């Protein structure tokens, strides 16, 4: 059933047809349903990979689970690296982000040492929906609601996520049908962590209120955001080609026809600041646009920089 289901998935076909099968990769293997599904998927596709399991020691059963993974990978002929995380990384005030930084640094280190071409991650449709909703509630811009992508990078190493369109329930049902055992990580339901609170409380509550599954609408929003971002980059590029640098001064022309297109004008200004190495707030961007649209000269401080707005020009010194 596993192979049959996966062979009928058009998006997986597209993903793997573009993958360089001559290279070897790294699989982040937790032992949960998601990463085990991905392990068998990669095997069924003939992908060469090394699995890496990070044991944080957060659960009493974690050492035993790591040993069971060793046996499973040995049976499947999959090379496995097990890393036991030092306690100083597991007792921080922000364990979620500390753990994420640790394992990504480890994955990158192994990729470079073993000449592995990318990192396979088992994020699925529910993870994607959580990411999008989190960004909506945090006030992300329309172009930044796209969530995770199937091919991103971290420290110049590709992050490969082929399961983003597949719901977790499908992964679990497929493994259950094949009698493939997997770890039920209790930290996934530990409400000390934001993701667990979203999973246990916010999503069920919203689905009860709306009487519908909200995952697919959020995935659609992510797709729309990605398409909008690509479109805006194309529209902004001709204006960004007018960026000039003289010594330590950067400048860009913002002509009147552009100023009349509010969304595009602010996008161009934001990208201009970003290319100079500055991330600006919505409030600051709005101030810059307001002075441009009213043709009012202004000087503003932005950390150690001076931003000058003149008629149709923004300068950074």
Swiss-Prot record:
Binding positions for ATP per the UniProt entry: 30-35
Record field: catalytic activity: cytidine(34) in tRNA(Ile2) + L-lysine + ATP = lysidine(34) in tRNA(Ile2) + AMP + diphosphate + H(+)
Primary enzyme class: ligase
EC number: 6.3.4.19
Coarse class of the protein's main subcellular location: cytoplasm
InterPro entries for the chain: Rossmann-like_a/b/a_fold, TilS/TtcA_N, tRNA_Ile_lys_synt, tRNA_Ile_lys_synt_N
GO cellular component: cytoplasm
CDD domains from the UniProt entry: TilS_N
Keyword tags: ATP-binding, Cytoplasm, Ligase, Nucleotide-binding, tRNA processing
Example GO biological process: tRNA modification
Subcellular location field: Cytoplasm
Molecular functions (GO terms): ATP binding; tRNA(Ile)-lysidine synthase activity
Free-text note on domains in this protein's UniProt record: The N-terminal region contains the highly conserved SGGXDS motif, predicted to be a P-loop motif involved in ATP binding.
Family according to the record: Belongs to the tRNA(Ile)-lysidine synthase family.
Record's function text: Ligates lysine onto the cytidine present at position 34 of the AUA codon-specific tRNA(Ile) that contains the anticodon CAU, in an ATP-dependent manner. Cytidine is converted to lysidine, thus changing the amino acid specificity of the tRNA from methionine to isoleucine.
Protein name: tRNA(Ile)-lysidine synthase
Gene: tilS
